[in-house]
Each structure stands twice: as structure tokens, then as C-alpha cells.
């Protein structure tokens, strides 16, 4: 597993514009850090499905069985494996720790005083964010050029920003804003009670904030190496530590204590 650090002061639009620092072992449970673990669906063979089903909790197993497509079923199961992996690695949370939900359906550890986590998956990436504080993460596969749609869920300010963007293709710029909006909603944990067009997130800046705790939050967004996916995270942290986990690491078991 390799790890990278993004510093808040150098966060930019695209992956090749970001300044990354390759690091070795770093201090976990740091109050100033947000941890991101991601794993590619491409690293899991379809034959791994029975093993993942066997290891899943009854609730997660039932949820996975509702999917028709194998890839969707795999994403559902891998996400829960990645959650357990990340919480144990980052905060030494026991693998069997109970997961509950708040009144709006946001998953939380049953121990509400423990670390917070959030999951997202789309396309080939499954992503987990962990933090001592509320956190939200979203990943989206970038639409094909010419297919990026700016819907009514974007604010007036965001539509104008996309109309005049000159720093990135429209499909990437749209995905940047959309994933920030989704990450912010997941950070708040208020479900669909907040309208998407009631706030704007442009260049890591929250405008017209929706109801909720917003002091000191940071937004981080980046593309993967081939610009096919965008990931955004919202939370309280001066740095984001990104780890890429292989499918084999999850299949081989959770990290040691």
C-alpha cells in the first residue's frame, strides 16, 4: 500500500497540478488529517464474489443480493471491507465494531464518540474516508466529452463558473463541483433535506452554506491519473493522506493490530 499527502494550501483542480509528497509510515489518529483509502474494482476477479459474500455482515449480504449486475454487487461488498480495513488501519477500530445509521440514514459507528467514516463508489473506484470529525466523500466517473450535463441541481454561481471555465474540460469541471456538493451533503449527514442548489462549492470555497456545522471545513478534489474519475472529500483537516489499497490486500485479510 502506498500513501500520498495533499496539503490544503496546494490543492488545485487537476491531479497533475497537485503537489504530492510521497511518504513512508506516518502518524495515524492525527486530528489534523483526513485519511482516504481507495481500491480499484479492476483488482478484484469475479471469482472473489463468494468469498466476499461469506465475509460480509448479514445486512451487507442482503443489500448486495439486491443488485442485478455482478460489478454493482462487488462494489457494495468491497465498500464494507474497505471501511473495516480503513478504520482498523487508521484508528485501530475492531473489525467487528457495530455500524448504525443516524436519523437521515448516514452510516456511523455505533460508538458515536469514535472516528467518523464515509463511503462512495462509482465506475472502477471504491473509496473510504476516515477522520476524527464528520467527513463526506464522493467519487464519480467523468462523463464522456459532450455528455456532461449541468442540471438544475447546480446553483446559479456554479452554472456561471462552468460556463466560463478555462482550466479544465467541462466534463471534469462539472464532476469536480458535483462531487464537492455530494461530499458536503454527506458531511452534513442530513440526507435529502438540503437542496443541492441552495449552496455553491467553487474552488474549494463554500458559498451560501446550507444548514449545519461549516466552520473550518475544507474541500479537496482531484482526478485519477487518466482523468477518468474525480474524487472529492469534505471535512476538517489540514492534509489528506491518500492510500491505494490492492484488491489482494483486502482479500488477504485486514491489517494487523
Task: Pin down the residues of each PLM region.
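Core catalytic alpha/beta fold that binds nucleotide/phospho-ligands
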Residues: 2-257
